Every structure is written in structure tokens, then in C-alpha cells.
Amino acid sequence: MKRFINCTLVAVMAIAVLIPGIAFAEFPEKPITYTIPFNPGGESDVTARLQEPELERDLGVAVNVTHKPGGGGAVAWSEFQRTAKPDGYSIIGCNIPHIIGQPLIRKDAGYKTDGFKIIMWFHFTPNVLVVSKDSPYKTLDDFIAYAKANPKAATVGGSGTYSANHLETLRFEKAAGVKLTYVPHTGTGPVIPALMGGHITGAMSYSMVGVSYKDKLRTLAVASEERVPALPDVPTFKELGYDIVGGAFRGVAAPLGTPQPIVDRLAKAYTDANKIISKKQLDLGFVMTYATGDDALKLVEKMRAAYSDVLSDIQKTKK
């Protein structure tokens, strides 16, 4: 009898190996925690709220969106890599270039760029330079003229340190020949009241901000190859003579070691959700992407190369 049971167990295990995903056919069976590493109100949060009902419909379980801001995402990412179980029930929002720049520049970042199992990169938002509507700076040239005449006096807020906003500010300084003072915030959400309250001169933020706050803010330039359809009257930096193109790719990741069938199931759910919410996202100034699997990894490497110069400059100044 014992021999029969052992043989049966071996046979079942063999079938599970031969038929990938058989052990995960029931995933998911309980609620999923979707952590956003920034404050509510920013692009990551807005997107997660649009995704949430579509994901729940697709997966058949609750998807609980939580927030853990701090360190431009580093607080949540480091905790996730330390503690999240690779079972698909803990997933987290990820941003490029944040996850590339922070571990390279900060010795204490607490996480590794390659320490995530990327499920999908689902959209991109180009950076924009914005000022308040009552600002004396009507154009990018106005802003640059002030910054040149008053080195370090112009304060530029943004989401996090060594984030897309921060790195774009550094690239802008170099391209325009100015010295600015960058003021990091825990996400896009807190940047807006700081700008409208007059606590900072301007903000290097994202296209969604230019669209959502067009009645309260003035967008001076957008860091895209072409004008953003949702901001048709805003010139690109390139149009104005500054070769600056960049922004944030956003996506979602699971812990390393998460079984591929689970990752594939989540990727399908996010892909389907992306298609459903795309119109709303496009209207807010987002550019939709659908990078999964090898394409997701290639995107990380492509952007690592794109930001190599500015990251190298930062490393030199820190030595």
C-alpha cells in the first residue's frame, strides 16, 4: 500500500512538471494587495484606481490598492524585495527610471533594479515643466532667463530623488546652462499644492499634471519627441532648441521567484485592463505601452542606456 501511495505521488508530481501551470490553475483564490509606492493623487494612484475594477472583474477576487510613499518609491520597493512572498498575492507598482537610478546612486537604496519580476510596463508619461498661472514666466525662455540671472534661486519641485522628474531637471540644467534647486517630494500629489501655494518656482512633473491642472498651471514645455495630443498647444523642449526627451514608464511587478504561470495570468489581466482604460488614460496625457516578458526586460536595458550619461555625471559629483 505504501509503495502504491509513493508511486502515485511521484506520478502526480511528474504530471505537474510536464504540464506547466497545473499547480497554479486556481490562481487567484484570495485578495491581491497592489502597493503603490507614492502618495495618493499622482499618476500611479490614478492609474491603479482605473485598473482596480477591471482587474477585479478579470481575476474574480478583490484587488486592494494600498500606498507606501517615501524615498521616491524606495521605501516600498526595499520592503517589497525583503518581505513579499512570491505567490502572486503581493504586487507593486514600478517606475523607470526610478528603479534604475536609485540603486546605482544610493548605497542605501535597499533594493536592486533586477530584484523584481516585471509583470508589465503599461504606460509612459513625458515630463513637463510647469509653473502656476499667476507666475511671471510665460514661456520657457522667460524661466531660463530668470534662472541664468539668479543661479540656484529657481526652485523646481518633483516626485522623489533620482526619479524621472529629478533626472530630467538635471538634464534641463545641463542643456539650458542654468543652476536650479531641485526640491523632492514623496510623489506627484504633494508637488501641486506646493507649486500653487508659491513654495516652489516651478515643477518638473508629468503630462497628466499639465492636462488635469490646465486651468491652474501653465505648462512651458513637454519632454516628448512630438507634442502630446492632450496638450496640443504646449511645445516640446526639442522644438525650443533643447534635446530633452524623457519621462516615466510605469508598470507592475511581482517578487522574484513568482511562478511564470502566475505572472502570465497577471500580465493578461493587466493587458486587458489597459485596453479598457486606454481612452481615459490618453485623455489624461498618458501614452499606452504593452511590454511584458522579454519586451519588459529589454525596456529596462534600453532606458538604463538612455540615462547612463546623467547617472554617470551624478556618480562623479558624489565621489
How does the language model describe each region?
Residues 1-12:
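Bacterial N-terminal signal peptides that target proteins for export
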Residues 25-114, 152-154, 161, 174-204, ...:
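N-terminal (or domain-start) structured segment
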Residues 55, 79-90, 103-186, 190, ...:
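Hinge/capping helix and adjacent helix->loop/strand transition within the periplasmic-binding protein
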